[in-house]
């Protein structure tokens, strides 16, 4: 498994509760994996300026054709705003038929946003 460094957002980690989101995308065909990985890296470039973003890790399990992220947010409304971001929408539309996406979101103490 490959994991990125922690990519910080503009929000401080703080002491309050946070929202954590985990995504796991498994591409149907190996040929789609490189571009899907690049799309994820492209999205991570938004992190330093995303309102409410505390940070994100990206990961890839290449033998299993899986990629994903664990992101930490100040509030669920901030996560929802990211989901509506034009670049995120564009990428999701481009890949929705090329794999299977699972995700989970939960509230957690602020320690989840600390390394």
Give residue spans per PLM region.
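Short S/T/G/P-rich N-terminal loop/turn motif that feeds into the first structured element of a domain
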Residues: 1-66, 78-81, 103-115
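Ligand-binding pocket scaffold of soluble enzyme catalytic domains
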Residues: 70
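An amphipathic, aromatic/His-enriched active-site/gating alpha helix that lines ligand/cofactor pockets
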Residues: 76-104
């Amino acid at each position: 498994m490959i994991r990125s460094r922690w990519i910080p957002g503009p929000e401080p980690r703080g002491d309050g509760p946070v929202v954590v989101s985990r995504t796991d995308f498994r591409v149907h065909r190996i040929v789609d994996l490189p571009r899907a990985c690049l799309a994820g890296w492209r999205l991570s470039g938004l992190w330093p300026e995303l309102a409410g973003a505390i940070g994100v890790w990206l990961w890839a399990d290449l033998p299993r054709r899986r990629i994903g992220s664990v992101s930490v947010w100040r509030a669920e409304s901030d996560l929802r705003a990211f989901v509506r971001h034009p670049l995120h929408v564009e990428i999701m539309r481009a890949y929705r038929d090329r794999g299977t996406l699972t995700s989970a979101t939960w509230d957690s103490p602020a320690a989840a946003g600390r390394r």
